[in-house]
A protein has these predicted regions:
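FAD-dependent oxidoreductase catalytic-site/capping-region signature
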Residues: 14-211
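Metal-dependent nuclease catalytic cores in nucleic-acid-processing enzymes
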Residues: 4
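Predominantly flavin-linked oxidoreductase catalytic cores and closely associated redox partners
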Residues: 1
Length: 211
């Protein structure tokens, strides 16, 4: 979720001015401090989408910046981003080889939000973010909900928008299943079925996200 803000300076403001870029560069060069010395997310939180849950199922990554998509320039307006991750998604995708050529790209179908439970959590996460942002002292600085937009109110609208703006957090697991069935990639010794001398020893063999 992206919110436009007022009376505060975000990285968007620095990035779109030459003086701002110089200030960021000098601060790091002279003091090893400032935006260039930090991770993008300055604030985090673990929360429950349902109070009845024993442990949190959502994780917040809040950044003092906003952008259209990863790799693109920051927005020209002042804003912050509250990214929410579903820690235990139910949706399941596929990764399939497309050729005997080891350099050929695989076909990846993530099927995000294909499970009803994930769609429910997505809508709850946006509503929870709105509730947090509506509280003082944040509320006095927020001028507009840029994404998904205040006009999106129903669960159906929020879920549809979540599908449009959602992205991975770059830590995929479970893409090379361990087991002995036809869908398994490795056995219990991490050896790849049908290929000698090859093992997979990372989180891709884990059946579920360890969070």
């Amino acid at each position: 979720t992206i919110y436009k803000v007022k009376n505060v300076r975000t990285l968007n403001d620095f990035a779109h001015k030459l003086t701002g870029k110089i200030q960021i560069g000098l601060e790091y060069l002279l003091n090893r401090s400032g935006p260039m010395s930090m991770a993008p997310s300055q604030l985090g939180a673990f929360v429950r989408s349902d109070p009845a849950m024993a442990t949190p199922d959502l994780q917040y990554h809040v950044q003092p910046l906003s952008l259209p998509a990863f790799g693109e320039p920051l927005h020209s307006f002042s804003a912050f981003t509250a990214s929410v991750c579903n820690l235990r998604p139910h949706s399941r995708g596929t990764v399939q080889i497309t050729s005997a050529d080891p350099f050929a790209k695989p076909h990846i179908a993530p099927h995000y939000l294909s499970a009803e439970a994930d769609r429910v959590v997505a809508a709850k996460a946006i509503r929870m973010t709105r509730k947090i942002v509506s509280q003082a002292p944040l509320a006095e600085h927020v001028t507009d909900e840029f994404l998904p937009g205040a006009d999106h109110q129903s669960d159906e609208e929020l879920i549809a928008k979540a599908g449009d703006i959602s992205t991975t957090i770059f830590h995929p697991v479970g893409t090379a299943k361990m087991g002995n069935d036809s869908q398994a990639v490795v056995n219990d010794r991490l050896k790849v079925h049908g290929i000698s001398g090859l093992r997979v020893a990372d989180a891709s063999v884990m059946p579920t996200i360890t969070s």
